[in-house]
UniProtKB/Swiss-Prot annotation:
Pfam families: PCRF, RF-1. Peptide chain release factor 2 directs the termination of translation in response to the peptide chain termination codons UGA and UAA. Belongs to the prokaryotic/mitochondrial release factor family. The gene is prfB. The keyword Protein biosynthesis applies. This is Peptide chain release factor 2. PANTHER family: CLASS I PEPTIDE CHAIN RELEASE FACTOR, PEPTIDE CHAIN RELEASE FACTOR 2. InterPro entries: PCRF (IPR005139), Pep_chain_release_fac_I (IPR000352), Pep_chain_release_fac_I_sf (IPR045853), PrfB (IPR004374). The modification N5-methylglutamine is found at Q250. Methylated by PrmC. Methylation increases the termination efficiency of RF2. One of its GO terms (cellular component) is cytoplasm.
């Protein structure tokens, strides 16, 4: 094997060793063992919420360990591939080994991103809200396309998704939607998606086939836990009930099961209509309200720190990504410069490259 390839393999070994140390592989195995014991408890399913969390955490931990062990095995096999290629003496065999080296580098770098998720709430599940912006019916349709994109991403990773509320627009699409992604580190990954997403395309709703620019806002919050101590006095919340509605304003429930919570001190309003009963909707809406109050508290603390440091802080608002379907095809992140020329794949949930680039960009900004 030539010195350059040896150096590449040594560098990958050093990176993977760092990943194994940061993730704590031995600790991960111990956590899996404990979760397996918890999952085998016959009384676990008496508490549905806890049971779902245990099984989700177990699946995620097992998958993470499996990926690390697979990367280590492939890295150990790589020198053997080059030895076999040298014995065969054929260019095809060398090219095959080089291709595996390139792919392994990409996979280890992707795993390395996981070690960058060290923020206070990065390990949490994520609560995502999408709102249509300027652009009329096209913007409502665009908001629904974004919702589908994130749900497809979660499905590809086998992450459970729970939709709390969907407010449908009159003609097509949605005014807004709120859903949770139930997976460890979902917040750390998806938090870089927060901001305004811009779509440029030939409008399917325009009889003259004119190009239309549409906007939608994405908000990502960490799901609250009991340790957050977000206490909401009963008198601070006004509860309104109404009938759930579907596309075009059509009623989808004959009872007043949908719930609207208004937090009187802050004016924050949360709705939930996707559960079957009023009680379930109220519980879900309260979870969303707690997450929004936690985020408000975090933003206030961050503003105080920025004032002490003498700077204005960084803004995640405004346009952060552009999706162009016409006159050319390109999805480009305006912060990281990462771009992909296949919008169809991106809109079908292939956003890992954007997430990885965003996480690396955020960490560089934090270090500045």
């Amino acid at each position: 094997m030539d010195p350059d390839r040896q150096a590449d393999i040594a560098a990958l070994d050093a990176t993977l060793t760092t990943v194994e140390r940061v993730i704590d592989v031995d600790g991960l195995r111990g956590r899996i063992e404990q979760l397996e014991k918890d999952a085998s408890d016959p009384q676990l399913w008496d508490d549905q919420a806890r049971a779902q969390k245990v099984t989700s955490d177990l699946s995620h931990a097992q998958g993470e360990l499996r990926r690390i062990e697979e990367l280590r095995g492939r890295l150990e096999d790589l020198p053997v591939l080059y030895e076999l290629a040298a014995e065969e003496g054929g260019s095809d065999e060398v090219a095959e080994a080089d291709a595996e080296l390139t792919k392994l580098r990409e996979d280890i770098e992707a795993m390395e991103v996981r070690t960058l998720l060290s923020g206070e709430y990065d390990e949490r599940e994520a609560l995502v809200t999408i709102r249509s912006g300027a652009g009329g019916v096209d913007a409502a349709d665009w908001a629904e396309m974004l919702m589908r994109m994130y749900i497809r991403w979660a499905e590809q990773h086998k992450y459970p998704v729970e939709v709390f509320d969907t407010s449908y627009a009159e003609e097509a699409g949605i005014k807004s939607a709120t859903f949770a992604v139930h997976a460890p580190y979902a917040y750390g990954n998806l938090s870089v998606e927060q901001g305004t997403h811009r779509l440029v395309r030939i409008s399917p709703f325009d009889n003259q086939n004119r190009r239309q620019t549409s906007f939608a806002d994405v908000e990502v919050l960490p799901v609250t836990e009991t340790t957050d101590h977000i206490e909401i006095p009963e008198g601070d919340v006004r509860v309104d009930v109404y009938r759930s509605s579907g596309p075009g304003g059509q009623s989808v429930n004959t009872t007043d099961s949908a719930v609207r919570l208004t937090h009187i001190p802050t004016g924050i309003v949360v709705t939930c209509q996707n559960e079957k009963s009023q009680l379930q909707n109220k519980v879900s809406a309260m979870r969303v309200l707690q997450a929004k109050l936690l985020e408000r508290k975090r933003l206030e603390e961050r503003a105080e720190m920025d004032a002490l440091k003498g700077d204005g802080g960084s803004s995640w608002g405004n346009q952060m990504r552009s999706y162009v379907l016409h006159p050319y095809q390109m999805v480009k992140d305006l912060r990281t410069e990462y771009e992909v020329g296949n919008p169809s794949a991106v809109l079908d949930g292939d956003i890992d490259g954007f997430l990885e680039a965003g996480i690396r960009w955020r960490n560089r900004k934090d270090d500045e």
